[in-house]
Amino acid sequence: MTEAQRHQILLDMLAQLGFVTVENVIERLGISPATARRDINKLDESGKLKKVRNGAEAITQQRPRWTPMNLHQAQNHDEKVRIAKAASQLVNPGESVVINCGSTAFLLGREMCGKPVQIITNYLPLANYLIDQEHESVIIMGGQYNKSQSITLSPQGSENSLYAGHWMFTSGKGLTADGLYKTDMLTAMAEQKMLSVVGKLVALVDSSKIGERAGMLFSRADQIDMLITGKNANPEVLQQLEAQGVSILRV
């Protein structure tokens, strides 16, 4: 039996058992203790197994960290990363946050992952990521799965009133002096029902959407506590929003 054949049999044993002793290897391969230890050492050096006292164990394959496939192709990705980082700094330990769907929402959830905050979401890609990363406190809002948005929606919207947060972070397809616009009516209507039970509403809108109208009006400008946007946002619209009491943070 060649060395390569011995190595393959040893690895097959580990794949089945997870752990083998030097004695197991000697008996299975009919080789001397010195040869068994030498084979284990070589496979350990090549990273194919982990050498332990009196034997070897299989290397546990870590699950790849989940992230949306197209996240880095999202429009204005770098700006959205800055927006998410700034938003995460608003939240204090022990507080709860509602995070809705979209690329900026995912980036924000990623920033908050591992911090002592409760994250409430109906966005399944974010929920999956948080669970995969073992975030301590995740609440997934119930309802019917909406494939196009990768979210859950309560058909009557009544369940959303059960959830309350210190902060609600949301985005949209446009923001003007009139307010924040969203294009998906079902999503917008479900989120609207939560506006009365959250402490502060923060709009996360990249600069390309400032001054744009698209879809339905989700919230009036005077309902928005803070806007976090990019430095290239339309200054005229920002002034109009500030005049209505919206706090502006440009990043």
Curated annotation (Swiss-Prot):
Source species, domain of life: Bacteria
Cited InterPro entries: Carb_Metab_HTH_regulators, DeoR-like_C, DeoR_HTH, NagB/RpiA_transferase-like, Tscrpt_reg_HTH_DeoR_CS, Tscrpt_reg_HTH_UlaR, WH-like_DNA-bd_sf, WH_DNA-bd_sf
SMART domains in UniProt: DeoRC (SM01134), HTH_DEOR (SM00420)
Residue ranges occupied by any HTH deoR-type domain in the UniProt entry: 3-58
Subcellular location: Cytoplasm
Matches recorded under Gene3D superfamilies: Winged helix-like DNA-binding domain superfamily/Winged helix DNA-binding domain
Keywords on record: Cytoplasm, DNA-binding, Repressor, Transcription, Transcription regulation
DNA-binding region positions on the chain: 20-39
Alphabetized GO MF terms: DNA binding; DNA-binding transcription factor activity
GO biological process, one term: negative regulation of DNA-templated transcription
Annotated Gene Ontology cellular component terms: cytoplasm
Pfam families attached to this UniProt entry: DeoRC, HTH_DeoR
Record-linked PANTHER family: HTH-TYPE TRANSCRIPTIONAL REGULATOR SRLR-RELATED (PTHR30363), HTH-TYPE TRANSCRIPTIONAL REGULATOR ULAR (PTHR30363:SF55)
Known function: Represses ulaG and the ulaABCDEF operon.
UniProt protein name: HTH-type transcriptional regulator UlaR
Gene, per the UniProt record: ulaR
